[in-house]
Amino acid sequence: MVRTYLLLLLLCGPATPFFNHLMDVTRRLLDSSNATWQRDQPDTHRLSRLDAHVMSMLGVGSHIDEVSVNHSQHLHNFRSYNCEEGRRTLTMMDPKSGKFKRLKCNENQTLSKDCASCIEKKSSIMKSEHLVYDDAICQSDYSSPEAMPDHETHLCRIGPLHIQHCTHEAKRVQHVSWFWIDGKLRVYDDFSVSWTEGKFLSLFDCLNETSKDHNCNKAVCLEGRCSGDLQFCTEFTCSYAKADCNCKRNQVSGVAVVHTKHGSFMPECMGQSLWSVRKPLSKRSVTVQQPCMDCESDCKVDHILVIVRHFYPDHYQACLGSTCLTGRAKDKEFKIPFKMADRLSDSHFEIRIWDKERSNEYFLESRCESVDACAAITCWFCRANWANIHCFSKEQVLILVAVSSLCILLLASVLRALKVIATFTWKIIKPFWWILSLLCRTCSKRLNKRAERLKESIHSLEEGLNNVDEGPREQNNPARAVARPNVRQKMFNLTRLSPVVVGMLCLACPVESCSDSISVTASSQRCSTSSDGVNSCFVSTSSLLQVSPKGQESCLILKGPTGTAVDSIRIKTTDIKLECVRRDLYWVPRVTHRCIGTRRCHLMGACKGEACSEFKINDYSPEWGHEEELMAQLGWSYCVEQCGGALCQCFNMRPSCFYLRKTFSHLSQDAFNIYECSEWSYRINVLVSTNSTHSNLTLKLGVPDSIPHGLISLSSVSQPPAIAYSECFGEDLHGTKFHTVCNRRTDYTLGRIGEIQCPTKADALAVSKRCISSDSIIFSKVHKDSVDCQSSIIDPMTIRNRNKLPSTVGSVTFWPTETSVEAAIPDLASATMLIRLDGYTIQFRSDSNKCSPRFLSLSGCYNCEAGAKLELEHVTDFGTALGILECPSLGYTTYYEVKNTLEKSIRTMHLNGSHVEAKCYFRCPNSESQLTIRGELIYLFNDDIRHHNQTLSPGLSPKSGSGWDPFGWFKASWLRAIWAILGGTVSLIIGVVIIYMVFTLCLKVKKS
């Protein structure tokens, strides 16, 4: 017995397909042709497979055109074809004409898989030979074509059917729900379907009482010549005597009624088809940068005048020298103020201007010639005008002399008044003082006499008063007493001189300056010389170098084993930005609500028992549309009980079921990325240049970037300022950025961006079920057969157009960048970069050329971002050489590419003193020259030059100290003559006094 069971178990596995096949054949022989056809339709045809008692699309015979030849001419590319195997006919609807076409093969032929031709293969009994492309159902009772409202959809085109004009379209293949009556097709986005019972003959099966045939002419029932059950006699007039037909309620679910915003109707057919559609696409809103052809600019001493003609300017961003300024223009002619230091050298400037709509960006480029350092100070009452004495005009000198004279007179008057007051007071106090002093002297004399008497009495009583050794000690004590005060007096005089000496030493100290260059010497062990005299060295180093302000360079000078400079790596700062470190939150679609509903009378379809209360939020009803696409979208499913009985077109008195699906439809194919700024960090763009390469790099803290045979990174940077903005930013598909108030993740507060949150762009474009929102975003109210839905979903496109960047929020101006957002903050940063070289190759020849440099000028400002400009001219006797200028007292080193033609070069120096006079050395391969650089620099206080609607972008702080050097002008060249006269006069007076004292001393000695 056990063996028998084991044998059956072993046979069950292999025999299962055979039994399944046998059951399928049996079912096909027993079932009706309609049931077999429904079962053999594709699995995606949920609607046509819904109920075996509902009429299929094959029943609309008069509207079907059969095609037996040239099938490929009728297969248009707005469908996706798959005829599988064993299909002899393909029926499909043309959305433009509203007609049905049936591709048909002969009896012994079947359609190919792509449906384009017929192949010699007979159809099988195991699969229905009729295939319908469209998932649809039909009914016998329907309204007239005029009862259908016009199209109400966001689609522009469906295949060849043109619905509405769209300027910008996006093509997509999707399932489209449609409704059809007698060759007329309509498409709606929002609709509901109710299945009603009532005075419809299609809900009853009538039997001819005489012939017992079901082919009874139902038209006679409308004349009252039929009898039937209670439901039939309730709706129609029954004749119980000599009735032609006897009618009973069949199993058809009811008659479908479609409800739209503009009316209701009964369709002849309704379904859903996979078609190629065109959806509206929003206009590309990316900001286009273009030159401002008819704009003018004029460089003034303290501002740039800009004139715009063909558009109305709004936000602008202007950079001159090391300063970048942002603001808003009030008119077509506006001024952009700049720091005085930015006019001390020839500077290229660039202005970016946005129009009022912020959809077009224009740029204007030009150059401002330098002005004299003293001429750059154009203000009268500002601090810079009175801090630089060597820039004083004649009027200022006269004012200074007058003010000094007035101060001296005022001081003399005060001293004279104090003297008069003191003299008058002394005259009053003098008698009292004389009496008091007389009393004090009298008392002191008496006390001294008594003390002497007492002392003499004590000494007389003591023994040993006549000791011989006491005499010498008493004689030496007065000498010591006299000597000690002399030593103290000398020490006191020395301490009085100490502050003066310290002050003189402080004035004698040289000025200090941070270097913007460092040198690296190659090891001789890693150098080699080729046969043609070319030396090759490999350099490996890790060096820290301070980042220069905008428009200036930092240099890494590479030297050979002999200490001769042979190459350099230049790092020029192009700009500095305070950029948002973005943290993506979610994607937001641009949608509106969409509600789909269908009502079933009790005991019809799925409305049975407690089915309505058991209906879940993710359940599906076939009348809603294509399940795969509809249920893949974010939405919520509900079942709402409605009335039953005759008043609600139902035969059953129990409540009917209204199946509701709340979902969304796109306003356009747009999605918006919403992100917040977790922090703000500096981003410094630099140009790294060697003798053979040029690379544009971006320096970020802790993010290295590659250079030839090395890496460069931002080693340290000052703490960025706190940005008083805690809201979000958004970005559309074209890169246009905007600021907005938004919900954070898992917060779905209505009325702000983030009511719907999608994890990816693809999810937002499809409003997939991976998106998250609250079902309260759509308010719905069911009215028996229809549903009224309302929503106030925020349109991100409106927010984008209103808050497009650049924009000023509070006191901060935000500017769009390629990947993030930049904030304009008037702060100076201090940054250091790390340069790592590993096997960097330098090649050079041992030349013997000499250099001839000459100092021309040194002008500009000290302790400022722009720095001072050092101008030299240089030339070699032959060839090209790399010259190094070193100023040890200033801590400054830089390089020059010296050629055999006379050239002028300008370098930037950062100093912290007003008067400069230092010895420098200019070294070439076969020469060393000594230069003396001299100059008078000015100090420009960091005054706020902005208007009320302007903001300074962040910059880099100067490499020297900060502050005003108030005593530096004492060393100015124009004061040297004065100091020489004063010094000569004082020296003459001191010499005369010394000679007189020596002469007097000699006379006293001679007389004694």
Swiss-Prot record:
One Pfam family per UniProt: Phlebovirus_G1
Alphabetical GO biological process terms: entry receptor-mediated virion attachment to host cell; fusion of virus membrane with host endosome membrane; symbiont entry into host cell; viral budding from Golgi membrane; viral budding via host ESCRT complex
Lumenal membrane side: 18-394, 514-977
Gene Ontology cellular component annotations, sorted alphabetically: host cell endoplasmic reticulum membrane; host cell Golgi membrane; membrane; virion membrane
Segments crossing the lipid bilayer: 395-415, 978-998
Fusion loop: region residues: 601-607, 644-655
Annotated signal peptide: 1-17
Protein's recorded name: Envelopment polyprotein
Record gene name: GP
